[in-house]
Amino acid sequence: MLSNHRSTVTLLLGGVRSGKSHYAQQFGERAGRVVFVATAQATDDEMRRKVDRHRSSRPKDWQTVEEPLAVAEAIALHGPTCDLMIIDCLTFFAANLLDAKADEQISIDGLCHALQSPPCSVVLVSNEVGSGVVPEYPSGRRFRDLLGEMNQSVARVASNVLLLVAGLPLVLKGELVPQVSPRVSPQVSQ
């Protein structure tokens, strides 16, 4: 059993290119072992380039897990092996749930349950889409509503919620720079 570790859950919200992912990576640079859960699926050339750019910006010693749908399960499976898990991002997770016609509420509830007592600290990245233009199509409005509901649910269980604007963090809940410290194994006496 590892000791001297207090798991925190931090939700980073912001618009497109607001600095969310970069800020999340800064958490990882202060942690020991990091698992990066990527929810995006490279479905076209533009997305492949974006995934490749994000992958190349991460330290090589981070473990990457590509998981578009089973995010709660990834926390349970990979969380015990790391000090910090970065989930980037809930925006693609929500889109993947809609595409898969998955039960959205069960998925949100499962994620929030996993975050209530995670085996490691968790940083989640998500877009804040509620401040933009109302989408023209029903599917766009459904996506906006689902992501808004997911963000609210995760924010309720998170220790810290930050809004990134132009790369600058604004504290909505908790601390500006939550502590993410490596777990310490107990000393074995000889």
Language-model-detected regions and their locations in the chain:
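Conserved P-loop
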Residues: 2, 9-77
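Short, high-confidence coil segments that cap the C-terminus of an alpha-helix
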Residues: 7, 31, 80-83, 119
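Structural motif
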Residues: 11, 86, 123-125
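Residue-level signal for inorganic ion chemistry
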Residues: 24, 54, 86, 127, ...
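Short, well-ordered beta-strand core segments
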Residues: 34, 85, 160-163
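Helix-adjacent hinge/juxtasegments
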Residues: 60-106
